Amino acid sequence: MNTGLYELPLVFFTVLAQSAVGAWLVFTFVLLNEKNTKSRTYIHKVMFVILALLGIGFIASIMHLGLPIRAFNSLNRVGSSMMSNEIAAGAIFFTLAGFYWLIAILGKMPVSLGNVWRIVTALIGILFMYVMNQVYHITSIPTWNNALTSWSFYLTVVLGGLTLSYALLIPNKQREYQLQHLPSLFAIGVSLVAIVAIYQGFNLHNIHSAIQNAADLVPNYAIMTVTRLCLLSIVAFLLFRVKNIGLLGISVLLTLVAEGIGRVLFYGLHMTYGMTIGG
């Protein structure tokens, strides 16, 4: 379990980056159909929050690497290393999103160009998420090299992205877009998280090395998972029931904490064939 806590910078990076990409996807769709100029101005202003969270995530990843220069050195292996591909894809996504926001907030972004720019950025974001997931599919780590890792990572994109975008977009008084389906999509996502977590809990006893059982790495798996699901259930209730900005902000925080708990468990399950790290 100690491994999960030691990897807190990666917990922050993965959860925040995934949530930011998920929110960008929602913003991209909303802006494609939003014609009201004042509404679009509002959307572009709150888009900064997405970039800020993404920036915090990248700062956390640099903390994990130790020195910023190591991130640049990692780019030398783009194409041959998934970690290098992850850094490159993330940097491109951040750059495209940042320049789009800057040009749009200055009022210099044509609508047609903006639509294309956001879609291209969204596609790069999806690639970023795919590569981030692939980084952890390591043959020698049986607890990570399975479909549950993909489900876990992509569901964070869904949950974090939906909550963040809903909290940012619903206060817009000039909006012409509708967001009534987002709470339902979030509830479906929570249900899938519960299914994945329960399945993983039962499956842990079947994964072991010569000296370690995977279940022993996360002795608090049950209580942490229950806590995570309770937090996500509270968020689902808030999304369905309230429009208060403060409570919606709390829903974002609770979602990030809940997914952070899930990610701590994920890193705590680091186990290689023949040896273990954690416990």
Swiss-Prot record:
Residues 1-9, 67-86, 140-150, 203-219, 266-279 are periplasmic. Heterotrimeric enzyme composed of a catalytic heterodimer (DmsAB) and a membrane anchor protein (DmsC). InterPro entries: DmsC. The lineage of its organism: Bacteria, Pseudomonadati, Pseudomonadota, Gammaproteobacteria, Pasteurellales. This is Anaerobic dimethyl sulfoxide reductase chain C. Residues 31-45, 108-118, 172-181, 241-244 are cytoplasmic. The chain crosses the membrane at residues 10-30, 46-66, 87-107, 119-139, 151-171, 182-202, 220-240, 245-265. GO terms for molecular function: dimethyl sulfoxide reductase activity. It is a multi-pass membrane protein. Signal peptide: none annotated. Its main location: membrane.
